[in-house]
Amino acid sequence: MSSVPVIPQARGLRHTGPVTVAVVSGPTAVGKGTVVGALLRSHPEIVVSRSVTTRPPRPTERDGIDYDFITPEQFDKLVDGEGLLEWATVHNSHRYGTPRGPVERAVADNRTVVLEIDLQGARQVRETYPQATQIFLAPPSWEELVHRLIGRGTETPEQQKQRLETAKVELANADEFDAVVVNDTVDHAVAHLVELLSL
């Protein structure tokens, strides 16, 4: 049996200054979508970048709201036309990406933009947009992360196993990020994000 990964502790930003683009990343089932959604509801002035993906929607997801669900061919056109700020193949299956245009328009309008993306995407944004503030959303414990993943009931046991292996890699690389927010409760995580983003 593999060992339980070390869970990063909460920490503040390593730098100061205004935050224009914020990356929120973290392992599967940590609650990225829930926390970012709650942040948007409490601060509608921010812009949350909507990702595109080639995976099918989960039962509770809506096309054009949670993600833009597109075909692999449509995704290829975006990649070829440099229409994505970042993209990655996640969990060795489906592709996800951040459309470039909406992010650039929001930045031009002096609005804070939040990108909810995985570790691979965060690394690409670090290269292409180094001024972005990178925030890692961590679970309170490994056991809680496993509980959340199994509890949502949207993946097969094999998919759960793959996602947990990916989560171990993501947790091991949390130190790459400018700050860590622990999602013990949504309210606490949102309050920490508000503080980090100076909203």
From Swiss-Prot:
The keyword Repeat does not apply. CDD domains: GMPK. Its EC number is 2.7.4.8. PANTHER family: GUANYLATE KINASE, GUANYLATE KINASE-RELATED. Its main location: cytoplasm. Signal peptide: none annotated. This is Guanylate kinase. It is found in: Cytoplasm.
